[in-house]
Amino acid sequence: MSVQRCNRIGWKHPGFTLIELLVVIAIIGILIALLLPAIQSAREAARRSQCTNNLKQIGIAMHNFHDAYKKFPTGGEGTNFKATPANTIFDMKDLHSTFTYILPFVEQKDIYDQININKTYRDTTAGPEHTSAFRRELAVYTCPSNPFLEYKDPAGFGRLDYYATVYTDIDPVTGHRNLATRVNGALAVPATGVASIADGTSNTIMIIEDVGRCAPGSGITFASYSKYHDPTTDLGGTLDPADQAVTDTGNPHSGTPPYRSVWRWADQDAGGSGVSGPSDACWDGRVINNNKTPYGGKAPDCTWDKNNIGLNDEPFSFHPGGCHALFSDGSVRFLSEQIKPQVMRLLVSRAEGKPLPEDFGF
């Protein structure tokens, strides 16, 4: 009997043609182009949510502080400006920032316990533990959307992306900066309580974003010392010689004493400031994210290294369209960068006595 053997027939699979390969590459490119914005949007949404949570935690801390001491912490920086009669001393500094005082209430009591509360953060006579406490980087005080988080403070102090709105210089008529129209915000020097916020806690901003001041060239230091508030007497005191005499060697933003660095959570001027807007020469119609574009500001006169320009001591964020604000009732809202300056004045002032427009929105 003959046996028939079946031979396997090998099938040849044809390869991709060049056209097919190009089509596949094009499809992959289209998918990536479609997915990348969605991924970036999801990441920003997560960062924005974390920023909101930071401010909520700060808000809870502020109210727990108020429960404990029957007043809010000081604004770090305050103002005793009066138009009538006019005076020339516009600023008063506490020994510490708002963010130093609330450390025990943001789960950082171990840091607070290292601090000599009667000495400023740059006073080296208070001992090494005092100085090292202020060098801690605290996630609750930084916005994750800050693109400059890789930059460290040259002197090693912890950074800050929020500040207390202690006053506003926005003119209620023109919407431009006008010192003669200054009014107090929710926090002050000396400290005040809920009762001082006559316009209502839900209508008055307490803390707002100012993100990115830690970037090289983004902020300036300036001789803003006038008088320290004496926490014992609740009166203006004298300058602390140790604080006045310090210059941070190697810090590109520092000059000669008594200059300070306005991006540290320990610094009174970083932790508290006004909402004023830029000078008329650099006015772009916004008090939130002013001069955000082009990146770095408009050269040569409206760049971010100038006071009150961009992220230098004004409301600013890298969230698209606006920034977060913590209100005095503990709520956090996102404010549009298109908000009218006059409305922003009403939101910052604590006792303006005027109603908010019903249609201004957030």
Task: Annotate the PLM regions.
Residues S41-F362:
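Internal low-complexity, small-residue/proline-rich segments
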